[in-house]
Amino acid sequence: MSRRMMKKPKLEETAGQGDPALPVYMLVGHGSMRPAYSVFKVDPYAGGAKGSPGRLLARLKCKHSKSFLPVRSKHGSWIVGVGGSSTKSRYGAEETIIFDTESHEVITGPNPGSTKPNPVLLAVGERIYAMARRPSINGRVDDAFDGRINFLPWFEVLDLSQAKVVGGCLTGCGWKALPSPAPVFPWGQNLHQYISRTTSDFAVRSYASVGCYILVSVSGQPGTYAFDTETEQWTTVDEKNDLPFIQLAIPHGPELFLGMSRATRAITAYKITVVAGVSLAIMEIPVLSDLPGDEEVMTTHNFLSLGIHRGFCSVTSWRVDESWDPPYLRAHIKMVAYGTEDFVEGRCIAVSKRWKQLFKIHDPVRTLDSPCVAGVFSI
């Protein structure tokens, strides 16, 4: 893969003004015949300076439609990928793959009990939770009437507390099926309805990990649901209101999260508190900026926290091929880091600085996914 940094960066502030250059890891997805993800390490504060392009650390050969998340455990700092498409091929059979950010080792983990395309992934301590993004089952419509349908384990957990890495493989652990999210997905329908309707009409649309609770809202029915990771029980914490953000809300500080607002489509902060697993309190805190080009804060779904006292970073990507049809060979990736003022409880988060970088990706051999950025993490 060839890659280079744009030589004319747009830069509002000089990099390195008291902010440490925290490492950011960016995953780029590759094409149809040889599915893989490239792991790059980039400096969010580089601002397009010469000699500081994204550095390729590893290429993870695994299935398409994988989800990734950062995990800190006794083993160190990992980026863990789970799930994938149901297509069987000799490329990327593993459904759990791990990248060690310190040793750059690629580790193979145990397969979940079911294949989950783009699953919802959340970490609570040293446990990784994987939930199907929408309910799914094995079998055909005709099988729904003779008992031959197998309900997949929609919700599973992988506990890393006793795991060991031996010869590039994760041992001493395995995925365990958890109680099906009955309040989340409509469990009361018959088998035929699960095939013909539920799989397309119900999907996880918002989620977050708050303390020992996993919060979920789904399309198709109102409300917010909580899974207690200690008791392994589901409860309804709000019967009428969904979580106010789209997809994942990421931790930004004590009880503080960043998410894409459902109402404004802007990156917004939220103070989220779960009270005894039975009620939910959410306070919205706007993210405001006086810098030109505020719309860039409004339009991206890939973003990460750099810490409550540093700010956050957004990443957008778009393909630049001459043809609209695949295969896709070229893409641009824009990374913008936002420095923020010290946060004061009850006030807005104010953006005061900004650094921009542009990467150009060209891969004529493996081709590129569209969009090509599969995730960005700081760990």
What kind of region is each of these model predictions?
Residues 7, 12-15, 25, 63-72, ...:
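Beta-propeller and closely related beta-sheet repeat lectin domains
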Residues 2-111:
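Beta-propeller domains
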Residues 4-7, 274-379:
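C-terminal closing repeat unit and adjoining cap/tail of repeat-based domains
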